[in-house]
Each structure stands twice: as structure tokens, then as C-alpha cells.
Amino acid sequence: MAVFVLVMILLAMAGHSSGTWCVCKEGLSEAMLQKTLDYACGAGADCGPIHQTGPCFNPNTVKSHCSYAVNSFFQKKGQSLGTCDFAGTATFSASDPSYTTCPFPASASGSGTTTPVTTTPSTRVPTTTNTRPYTITPSTGGGLGIPSGINPDYTDPSFGFKLQSPRFGFIVLFTLFLPFYLFS
């Protein structure tokens, strides 16, 4: 009995690192990713680290820079619903996309506080054309045919239905079942 209580206390106190990141989707054209990158940087993402002298410049690919920018925007907006959609070009990731020299923020406090860059963006000629309308606006939606921002292709199928901190789950279980063991 005492061992069970001790194990439950240790499990409740055990730390657990969890996070949610926003990354650009695979298989999209560079033109679409560039539009998403430009929007995120212009809308307040901290894009300093992906500039040429920044720690996240390499790998110097549009997808890599796009993922950093949309994640920065998502974290700055407090991981709010609809801030990781970007007209379908971005999605949630439960695995940390950080790499050696480039830590991706996992919260608003780690996403920097720089103001949007006002320099003229480089011009790129798209190699493909997209015939459907394309706009990049984060949506909160939810009414009369307007999308709610809930992305149907999350990579983590339990995303909306899991506890963000397993510690809370252990505390609840411990609190619920402790009286049964103490008074039985």
C-alpha cells in the first residue's frame, strides 16, 4: 500500500516536456510556401533568425524558413485556434522541429519580440500556377459556412482530446483513487 502511494506521488511529480509546433506542409510549391512565409513575417512573426546572418538561415530553403516563420507566428498568438492554418499550407506538429543551431519556440515567451520586417521582399517567379483562389489569412471562423480553423489532417490523431500535461492526469487519478485505498 505504501509503495503504491509512493509510486503515485513520484509519477505526479515527474516532469514531462510537451509542446505543439506549427510547420509548413510537405509537397507544396515554393510559390505557396513563399506567400505563407511573407504573410507570417509581415503579420508579426519573429523572422530575424531566418535572415542570412541568423542561426536558422541554414538550411536555406523556402520550406525551412516557412516552418520557422509560421511557428513563430503561432506561438506569438498563444497557439490560438486558427493561427496554424495559413490557408491550408501549415499544420500542427507534436514533434519538435528544432535542429542543432536553431531552436523553434514552443511557447509565446520563446518566440521573440521583434517587430515585423519592412524591407522589400525578394521577387520570385513561380514555376507553377495555381488556378484556385489563394489567400492567406488566419481564421477564427466558426459561423455560417466559415471554416472553424480546425484542420482535418493533424499528424497527431488525438491532438484535440489529450491532456497537455500528463502530470495533471496523475494528480486527478491519485486524488480520485487514494480514498479507496486508504479506507478499504
UniProtKB/Swiss-Prot annotation:
Pfam families: X8 (PF07983)
Residue span(s) of the pro-peptide: 159-184
Residue numbers with lipid attached (GPI-anchor amidated serine): 158
Reported tissue expression: Expressed in the shoot apical region and in young leaves but also detected in the laminar and vasculature of mature leaves.
Source organism superkingdom: Eukaryota
MF GO annotations: (1->3)-beta-D-glucan binding; polysaccharide binding
Modification after translation: Contains two additional disulfide bonds.
Principal location listed in the UniProt entry: membrane
Compartments it resides in: Cell membrane; Cell junction, Plasmodesma
Residue stretches in coiled coil: none
Annotated region (Disordered), positions in chain: 109-146
InterPro entries: X8 (IPR012946), X8_dom_prot (IPR044788)
Topology versus the membrane: Lipid-anchor; GPI-anchor
Cysteine pairings via disulfide bonds: 22-84
PANTHER family assigned: BETA-1,3 GLUCANASE, PLASMODESMATA CALLOSE-BINDING PROTEIN 3
Name of the protein in question: PLASMODESMATA CALLOSE-BINDING PROTEIN 3
Species, as recorded: Arabidopsis thaliana
